[in-house]
Structures are given as structure tokens and as C-alpha cells.
Amino acid sequence: MAFADRLLAAWYAGHPALALLRPLEALYRRVVTRKRARFLSGESASYRAPVPVIVVGNITVGGTGKTPMILWLIEHCRQLGLKVGVVSRGYGAKPPQLPWRVQANQCADQAGDEPLLIVQRTGVPLMIDPDRSRAVQALLASEPLDLILCDDGMQHYRLARDLELVLIDAARGLGNGRCLPAGPLREPAERLLDADAVLFNGANADRADGFGFCLQPSALVNLRSGERRALDHFPAGQRLHAVAGIGNPQRFFNTLLGLNWQPVPHPFADHAQFSAQSLAFSPQLPLVMTEKDAVKCRAFAADDWWYLAVEAQPTPAFSAWFDNQLQRLLRKP
């Protein structure tokens, strides 16, 4: 297990050695708290877009189901007749220039795995740039939009936001509740009090402190042909290699177990790069991966490689709440 994986496990399981990092944690907390205070007071300038900006992010390190939720938000807004754009940092992307408009035919090295997935699934206009405010301005200059979704960027305060949605893994929660590097929190836990909504991935029902949503498997999709198969394509008890280069690989493996398959788990680091050699496992079995990983593997995929398509399913209460927020934001002068 890599050091980063061991550290992540310690943050969520708890480890007495982390107490040695508390002086650094105190320094980190002071820095991030002061940074946010400067933007809230107006001491540091932020860019406010002429259309509503909705930030979808988290305060923890590790996967929380952010990309499936963004896909749900895009589709939901479109059903309401709204034209939506997305901005993202584009983690790991190496575009020729910044800002960079992501197209469906680009490679993940150029566009980033998550932005490419979003564009391939939805065709939404999407701009990547570590400077999200610059990405928003470039996106609005390219075409008219009703609102913008910011993929992550909770801590990017140079971009003013009209709505903040914070996602948390319901099983792992906030780990040991401590900030980096002594814990998984990017900001202190009390930051949640200022968010407009907290959504718990894996909660089948709403909670007193937020809404619930689940990731529902919908189909198997072949990497080479694009063919979609029902989930019963593999019988109960099927052994298969399971690949996950996401923030919380175990959640993916648990999903496969829940489908009554027998996965041989192969966890990789989040945003990992793959090759045919790195995925040449023994014994020879069908291989199932996440959709985020699949966008990086199509060029060398074997015939029996599949990705598991999943859809975010928030509770009806969240859908109603979100519709009310949209009405409020879009009728602002």
C-alpha cells in the first residue's frame, strides 16, 4: 500500500501517531481560516459572474460521489429548460493553453478524466482552468448560459458562488475530524454550517444534518464497442477483476459485491494513469472498472473490459429543495 493510501486509511480509521501532526494542523487551520475571512470581508477580491454559480464540492480528501451528482444536476437543469455550463480545475490535465474548452474527442491527458467523462456523457460546455474565475469568464464569452456548475472549488474563494453543495461519504463521514495533515479535512468541520446543503453519499434517506443520495448501478458498458448490457450480463458469483482509480476505491468494490459478483480488487490512486501492462492481471477474467477510469483505457481495452455506469439518485426532498433554490437564483435581477 502506498504511503498516501496508508495515510488516508489512518485519517478515517484513526491512528495515535497522527497526534504528532497536530502542530502542523493548527498552522494549516489558521491559514485556511484567514484566507476565507479575507474573501468574506472583501479584503481579497473575488469574481462574481453575471449568472448563478453553484459549487459542488467537499471539505474532505477522498471520493464523495461528486461527478455522478454533477451529472444528475446537469440533466435535472436541462429538463427545466436551462442551459448549463461547467468549470473544473482539470486535475492532472495538460492542455495546450488555459483556459481550455474540453471536447468529447480529446484524450484524458489533455482534458482530465473527470471533465472528459462529464463532456462525453452530457455534451455540456466545460472549461478547465485552476483559476475557476477565469474559466467562468471564458465560458460565458463563448456562449450564453443560464447558470454554471463548479466541479469542486469549495476552497477556491476567488470565484464568488450563489449556492454551495457539500458532499460527504456517509460511511466514512469526516474521519477523525481533524484538518490536514492530521486528518482528511480541507477546512474545519464548522465550515459545513455555512454551506447551503450537505449531501451524504450512501444515505438512503435524508438526515437531520443533510440530504441523502445513492449511486445506483444502471448498466455495464463495453470499453471497445460501447455496447450496453444489463447488469445480469454477469451471473451471480461471477469472478472478475475490479479496477478503481478513484478517491474511495472500496466503495466501488462494495458496489460490485452488492451485485453478487466476486471482484478481485485492484485499487489505484485517484486519477491514476493506466496502460495495458498495468492492467494485465492473472488469472484471465472479465475486467470491470469505473467510468472515470474507462475514459483513460479505451485505446488499449480488451474485448472483455467493461465499466459500470452509475447514476446519482438524490432524495425527493433534495430535488424539491434544489428546484426552489433555482427559482430563487434565476429570478434575481
From Swiss-Prot:
This is Tetraacyldisaccharide 4'-kinase. It comes from the Bacteria. Pathway: Glycolipid biosynthesis; lipid IV(A) biosynthesis; lipid IV(A) from (3R)-3-hydroxytetradecanoyl-[acyl-carrier-protein] and UDP-N-acetyl-alpha-D-glucosamine: step 6/6. One of its GO terms (biological process) is lipopolysaccharide core region biosynthetic process. GO terms for molecular function: ATP binding; tetraacyldisaccharide 4'-kinase activity. Keywords: ATP-binding, Kinase, Lipid A biosynthesis, Lipid biosynthesis, Lipid metabolism, Nucleotide-binding, Transferase. Transfers the gamma-phosphate of ATP to the 4'-position of a tetraacyldisaccharide 1-phosphate intermediate (termed DS-1-P) to form tetraacyldisaccharide 1,4'-bis-phosphate (lipid IVA). Its EC number is 2.7.1.130. InterPro entries: LpxK (IPR003758), P-loop_NTPase (IPR027417). GO terms for cellular component: plasma membrane. It comes from Pseudomonas putida (strain GB-1). ATP binds at residues 60-67. The gene is lpxK. It catalyses: a lipid A disaccharide + ATP = a lipid IVA + ADP + H(+). NCBIfam families: lpxK. The keyword Lipid biosynthesis applies.
